[in-house]
């Protein structure tokens, strides 16, 4: 498997996280603050300049109010992100 910032699989994973952030109505700055990271951390992984690991994926999902296990299952199954109650992914 290709381990690249530009692989279609990785791009889809990042698109999933971006969609969850948008569905939750959370700006990059707010997410960064929740994670205790600079806004550039969010911009870099969303822009494809930086990879995230599984621990970061879990932290990001939780900071956005999403269940990381469900989110990853849906990603693997190729399901699109849907906005649930209060704009949260569900």
Label each region the model flagged:
Residues 2, 8, 62, 70-90:
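Short, charged recognition helix plus adjacent turn
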Residues 27, 38-41, 53, 67:
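Short coil turns linking two alpha-helices in DNA-binding domains
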Residues 49-61:
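Short, basic-rich loop-to-helix N-cap that marks the start of a DNA-contacting helix
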Residues 15-34, 59, 85-88:
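Short basic helix-loop element that most often maps to the first helix and adjoining turn
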Residues 38, 49, 75-79:
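The DNA-recognition helices of helix-turn-helix-type DNA-binding domains
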Residues 1-23:
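A short, Lys/Arg-rich alpha-helix, primarily the initiator
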């Amino acid at each position: 498997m290709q381990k690249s910032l530009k692989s279609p699989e990785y791009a889809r994973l990042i698109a999933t996280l971006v969609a969850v952030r948008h569905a939750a109505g959370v700006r990059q700055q707010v997410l960064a603050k929740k994670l205790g990271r600079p806004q550039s951390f969010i911009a870099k992984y969303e822009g494809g300049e930086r990879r995230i690991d599984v621990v970061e994926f879990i932290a990001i999902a939780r900071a956005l109010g999403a269940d990381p296990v469900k989110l990853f299952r849906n990603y693997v199954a190729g399901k699109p992100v849907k906005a649930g109650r209060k704009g949260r992914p569900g």
